[in-house]
Amino acid sequence: SEFFLQVLGPHLKYSCGWWDDSINNLEQSEEAALKKTCENADLQDGQNVLELGCGWGSLSLWMAKHYPNSKITSVSNSTSQKAFIDQRAQKRGLENLEVITCDMNDFETKKRFERIVSVEMFEHIRNWPVLFNKVASWMKKDSKFLMHVFCHGKTPYFFEAVNEDDWMARYFFSGGIMPSDQL
């Protein structure tokens, strides 16, 4: 976590930021992207929200703060990230956030949610149809699911570490996929 504290903005958001003419620095870009994600997901205070793949908690903590009557459940595959998020939530007095440590391929819950949000996590998953079926089972009747992924304009490909130059596959997306616009 020390490395990320040095190179990321104050929210520790390691997915894309939002930049327009009014944005002057990384902190503003992170804040704008978090706000835009919540707007695109049509989040309302009081909803039960599930975040799939929460990283260092940028969106989880932002939602817990800005939607204090909502119950935020976030899933991370990292015990160190869960501990980091729990510590920040406690320090900020946020009691409406629960972080679960689990691989997304194995995650199950009996809870149902009004909103499910996933930011740049599906690139780590190879069997999207299985996870889409799970997501559908976790949704209430009028729920919404926001999935934010980066993708290649034309060609999908797997992140595979074939040689030393394949640093993305080796260090960031081992076993993942670059989806395409047509996938």
Regions inferred by a protein language model and the residue ranges of each:
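Conserved Class I S-adenosyl-L-methionine-dependent methyltransferase catalytic core
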Residues: 1-40
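Conserved class I S-adenosyl-L-methionine
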Residues: 46-55
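Conserved SAM-binding loop of SAM-dependent methyltransferases across substrates and taxa
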Residues: 56-68
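Conserved SAM-binding strand-loop segment of SAM-dependent methyltransferases
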Residues: 91-104
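A short acidic, Gly/Pro-enriched loop at the edge of an enzyme's catalytic core
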Residues: 105-116
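A short glycine-rich, Lys/Arg-flanked "PGG" loop and its adjoining helix->strand segment in the class I
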Residues: 129-142
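Conserved beta-strand signature within the Rossmann-like core of class I S-adenosyl-L-methionine
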Residues: 142-150
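Short, glycine-/aromatic-enriched active-site segment of Class I SAM-dependent methyltransferases
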Residues: 152-174
